């Protein structure tokens, strides 16, 4: 699987050689043959064929000039494969083996833009769900995968026409959301809230509005803005706000972001004139602990990066720290209130520092179990470092800051300060150091696009720590450029001036780090 997954990043002549239409047709025909004899698991390697086809559609969508056009020959072949798979009785098996393959095939129906053809299949998967699935993660994932074509199909005219002609899929989604309210507040809450979200998504389409509006209102009435049913309420309300805003009073969702903020973040506390916390459930003691940690971090940061204070001409003098009571609450509310992705451990928005009304903020949550951060606020000091770095080291907004490969610095510094300031050993980084996975010169090229979590965070930490301990003058040189907005000049310091010169020394340093040199002492 790992080998096939690498194909999603193929470009250029390789993309044409691997994914041109005749190649895809050959694989689609092989998938059809495998689907006809599918036994309910991956013993015949059907999964690999499906992943290859998904990769082909993905690469062609993103690099059509590399791959070339796809036409009716491929459409016919892929429909034959999908038809054969879904007609096979084993595609209905409730088992770990079938769940793995079924979910991928469902997503393939979306990749191929065949959503309208398989509405009955999607209904079958949703209505088939029952408690027997709960002990089989891959079956739960397969049910959730159905929401991908149902959601993305809304941009496909053929799909919208199919749903308009037979809107029973909307009734299936509504019934799923109503029949499984008991999932809300559990670790399977997403199955129910995603059903409600998809019901609401159809309200964009005028021919479906008379059907969808009362269903949305019914789901809102069956749930509440806070408490265990909030994930359903918020997702449906968000669809009304996005696609039927003119009728907000009918749903009771006018000024939705304000409603959600008042309901979910009732606590407002000023640490001082420039640091404000908005929280869901922090106690007075929690607020005191968080404020003390934030305010004391400034001096530690300044001593480390040796800045001259805030970058002149930027509006980043105040910061708001938003803290939800749990990861579930963060994922329920943060996207709807602030428009952020919540598939992360928190996020910092520096905004547009050229605007006088700019308000940087970090959006976080309390983690259970607590990992030792003040007030249990996960990544509190990591996210606050992002704010300080933007204010004092990196001129411009986030897009300007990332015009060059500098994720090793952005995320590595945040990790290094977070662990060093708290005097905690980064056990994950120490473990990675012993593996010697990356050269320093490779880490210097890290971007959010080419790096996974391990390369971004523990290896970013290691790169930054090494540079501070062994070559602080290079960091000073680099930051001198970053602070004026000269990101190309800063990049040249480590890409051109340093290049590969430190790779051998970094490798030796990693050995020492893994042997105890990277203990929990405070960074200097």
Predicted feature descriptions by range:
Residues 53, 61-68, 277-282, 405, ...:
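Extended, non-catalytic scaffold segments that flank or surround catalytic motifs
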Residues 69-75, 214-219, 427-435, 473-490:
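Short alpha-helical "patches" and their helix-cap loops
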Residues 168, 289-292, 296, 375, ...:
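Extracytoplasmic/secreted proteins, especially bacterial periplasmic and envelope-associated proteins
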Residues 404-474, 524:
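Metalloprotease/metallohydrolase-associated module, dominated by Zn2+-dependent proteases
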Residues 351-430:
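Zinc-dependent metallopeptidase catalytic helix centered on the HExxH motif
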Residues 119, 136-140, 144-152, 157-160, ...:
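Catalytic domains of carbohydrate-active enzymes that cleave complex glycans
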Residues 1-22, 38-41, 174-361, 443-457, ...:
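Non-catalytic architectural context of zinc metalloproteases
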Residues 1-249:
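Non-catalytic all-alpha helical scaffold/repeat segments
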């Amino acid at each position: 699987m790992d080998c096939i997954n690498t194909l999603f990043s193929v470009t250029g002549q390789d993309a044409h050689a691997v994914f041109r239409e005749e190649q895809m047709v050959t694989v689609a025909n092989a998938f059809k043959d495998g689907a006809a004899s599918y036994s309910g698991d991956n013993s015949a390697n059907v999964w690999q064929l499906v992943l290859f086809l998904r990769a082909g559609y993905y690469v062609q969508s993103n690099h059509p000039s590399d791959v070339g056009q796809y036409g009716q020959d491929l459409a016919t072949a892929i429909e034959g494969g999908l038809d054969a798979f879904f007609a096979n009785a084993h595609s209905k098996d409730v088992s770990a083996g079938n769940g793995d393959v079924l979910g991928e095939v469902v997503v393939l129906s979306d990749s191929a833009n065949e959503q309208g053809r398989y509405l009955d299949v999607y209904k079958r998967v949703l209505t088939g769900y029952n408690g027997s699935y709960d002990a089989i993660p891959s079956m739960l994932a397969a049910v959730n995968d159905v929401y991908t074509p149902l959601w993305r199909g809304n941009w496909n005219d053929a799909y919208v026409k199919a749903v308009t002609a037979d809107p029973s899929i909307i009734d299936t989604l509504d019934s799923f959301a109503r029949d499984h309210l008991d999932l809300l507040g559990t670790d399977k809450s997403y199955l129910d809230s995603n059903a409600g979200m998809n019901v609401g998504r159809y309200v964009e389409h005028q021919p479906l509005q008379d059907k969808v509006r009362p269903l949305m209102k019914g789901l809102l009435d069956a749930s509440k803005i806070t408490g265990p049913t909030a994930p359903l309420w918020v997702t449906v309300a968000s669809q009304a706000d996005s696609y039927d805003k003119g009728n907000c009073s009918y749903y009771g969702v006018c000024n939705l972001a304000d409603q959600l903020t008042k309901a979910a973040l009732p606590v407002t506390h000023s640490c001082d004139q420039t640091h404000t916390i908005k929280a869901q459930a922090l106690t007075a003691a929690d607020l005191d602990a968080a404020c003390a940690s934030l305010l004391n971090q400034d001096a530690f940061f300044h001593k480390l990066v040796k800045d001259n204070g805030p970058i002149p001409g930027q509006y980043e003098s105040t910061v708001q720290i938003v803290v939800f009571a749990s990861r579930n609450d963060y994922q329920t509310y943060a996207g709807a209130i602030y428009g952020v992705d919540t598939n992360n451990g928190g996020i910092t928005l520096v905004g547009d520092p050229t605007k006088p009304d700019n308000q940087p903020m970090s959006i976080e949550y309390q983690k259970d179990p607590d990992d030792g951060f003040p007030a249990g606020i996960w990544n509190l000091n990591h996210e606050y470092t992002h704010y300080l770095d933007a204010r004092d080291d990196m001129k411009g907004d986030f897009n300007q800051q990332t015009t060059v490969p500098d994720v090793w610095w952005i995320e590595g510094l945040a990790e290094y300060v977070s662990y060093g300031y708290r005097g905690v050993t980064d056990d994950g980084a120490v473990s990675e150091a012993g593996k010697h996975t990356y050269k320093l010169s490779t880490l210097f090229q890290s971007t959010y696009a080419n790096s996974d979590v391990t390369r971004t965070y523990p290896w970013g930490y290691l790169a930054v720590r090494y540079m501070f301990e062994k070559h602080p003058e290079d960091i000073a040189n680099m930051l001198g450029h970053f602070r004026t907005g000269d990101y190309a000049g800063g990049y040249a310091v480590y890409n051109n001036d340093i290049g590969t010169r430190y790779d051998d020394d970094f490798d030796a340093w990693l050995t020492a780090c893994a042997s105890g040199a990277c203990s929990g002492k405070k960074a200097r």
